[in-house]
Structure formats: structure tokens, C-alpha cells
Regions:
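Loop-helix junctions at membrane interfaces
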Residues: 1-269
Length: 269
């Protein structure tokens, strides 16, 4: 197989099925680790469609991610899960299509870092807002009549949770997977990818991509602890005491880890 044979429909179908299967299996491993709100899972398996997007292009990655997330959500719930159909499927499709569109056969480390941030942010915003404003309002009666400000806060909280728990895995693990693919099957990898792997990952850009979200999370944690934001969360139906405490811990722990990683990569320059 070479890089041009990926365009063949049969090969593209096989790659799409592989992406969907691996993504579903990887996602199921953490399917029961929820967000602070009890729905929306911790999902480091996003490294799988990110890898497929870079190596095989936007279509196999986007379709594979959409099918994979629908499969794992449906297995978890025991039926075709409407929340996945309404929110997770379009969000995963759009996010990984963007990553593949901008990186496939146009790869550089700088683009990879930038587009990974953008793709994950777009995907998580789409999933969070569709899940809250479409699925929750349409299918769960307790959300009917909830104020828009509360729903927006919930969607933004989900977006933040997903983004900060996915980004480090994509930026740190995906390059290793790409390197393994290039070393194992160099004939079907595009020349620009092989060339890019011969260059050093830009530590300053990788550092900024980690340090920026890390500092933001630490600031949010401090605001929750020491300002009226914490009281607002306690009295907000979208949060409550348990969610507030989990978010507080999450902000400090993830913020410290991301900041430490960012500073580490800066020191390696």
C-alpha cells in the first residue's frame, strides 16, 4: 500500500472501520469516568481519530470518530443513545474533519499544535451546546424552563472539562503514534509527514499550548475558591456543591499539570 492507494474506496472504508472500532474500544475503557455533572465522559481516546486524521485524512477520521462515539455511547446505555446522535456524532465529525483537512498532506509541527487546539475546541463546543440545548431540553423534563444563563454555564463547563482533559493526550501521545506509523509503514505515509518527523517539535509552541490553558485553569480555580463565583456555583442548578468541589479540584490539578508541562517544554528550547 502507498499513500495514493488510501484514496481507493475499499481502502478508505477499511481505514474508517478501523478508526471507529479502535475509538469505540478506547473510549469504552473510560466510559464510566464522568464529568463533574455526572454526564459526559473523560475521553483520552481522542488520540485515535486525531492520529487517523493526520495520517489518513479528514474523511476516515471524521466518519470513524462519529461512528465510534455513537457505538460506545450506545453500548454504555444499552440502546441507540439520542444524546450521542444529536451532539456527540456531529461534534466529533466536525472536529476531526477540521484536523484532517488542515493537516493531512500539509503537516508541520506548528500546524499540528495550532490545529489540534482549534479542532478540539470546536468539537467540544459543538458537543456541549448541542447536548445541553438540544438533547437535555428535548429529552429531560427537568431542564425545560431552565434559564438560558444556567444552560450556557453548563455547556461552557462541559467544554472546559473536555478540552483540558483531551488536549495533553493529543499533543503528547499522537506524535508518538505518528512516528510509529511512519517507521512501520513508511510507504503509505505522505512525504511531508516523513519530512516533518525529521525536525524537532517546537518546544516554545508546545509550551504555550500547555501553559496557556494551565494558567487559565489555575485562575478559574482561584476565582471559584476566593470570589463570589464559588457562591454562584453553589446556588446554580447547573452546578451545586458536589460539582463545584470537583471543578475546583479539577482546575487546580489539571492547571498545575498543564502549567508544569508547559514550563518543561519551554526549558527544553
Amino acid at each position: 500500500m502507498n499513500s495514493t492507494s488510501i484514496e481507493r474506496p475499499s481502502v478508505k472504508l477499511m481505514i474508517t472501520v478501523m478508526c471507529a472500532t479502535l475509538y469505540a474500544v478506547g473510549s469504552y475503557m473510560t466510559a464510566y469516568i464522568p464529568s463533574p455533572w455526572g454526564f459526559g465522559q473523560f475521553r483520552p481516546a481522542v488520540v485515535i481519530p486525531a492520529f487517523f486524521a493526520v495520517v489518513f485524512g479528514p474523511q476516515p477520521a471524521a466518519v470513524g470518530a462519529a461512528l465510534g462515539t455513537l457505538l460506545v455511547d450506545s453500548i454504555k446505555h444499552g440502546y441507540i443513545y439520542p444524546g450521542s446522535l444529536i451532539a456527540a456524532v456531529p461534534g466529533n465529525f466536525l472536529g476531526f474533519y477540521l484536523i484532517g483537512w488542515f493537516l493531512w498532506r500539509k503537516f508541520s509541527w506548528s500546524r499540528f499544535i495550532l490545529i489540534s487546539n482549534i479542532g478540539l475546541l470546536v468539537a467540544n463546543i459543538v458537543v456541549a451546546f448541542l447536548y445541553v440545548f438540544a438533547y437535555k431540553v428535548l429529552y429531560q423534563s427537568q431542564y425545560i424552563g431552565t434559564s438560558v444563563s444556567v444552560l450556557v454555564a453548563l455547556a461552557l463547563g462541559l467544554t472546559l472539562f473536555w478540552f483540558v482533559t483531551m488536549l495533553p493526550f493529543v499533543l503528547l501521545i499522537t506524535p508518538t503514534l505518528i512516528q510509529v506509523a511512519v517507521n512501520t509503514f513508511p510507504s503509505f505515509v505522505s512525504p511531508d509527514l516523513i519530512e516533518a518527523l525529521g525536525r524537532k517539535v517546537p518546544g516554545n509552541e508546545l509550551g504555550v499550548s500547555m501553559l496557556g490553558p494551565g494558567v487559565i485553569l489555575l485562575v478559574v480555580g482561584l476565582l471559584v475558591t476566593y470570589t463570589g463565583l464559588g457562591s454562584w456555583m453553589l446556588n446554580n442548578p447547573a452546578f451545586g456543591a458536589i460539582a463545584k468541589s470537583i471543578i475546583e479540584v479539577l482546575c487546580y490539578v489539571c492547571g498545575a499539570v498543564l502549567s508544569a508541562l508547559g514550563l518543561y517544554f519551554f526549558r527544553r528550547i
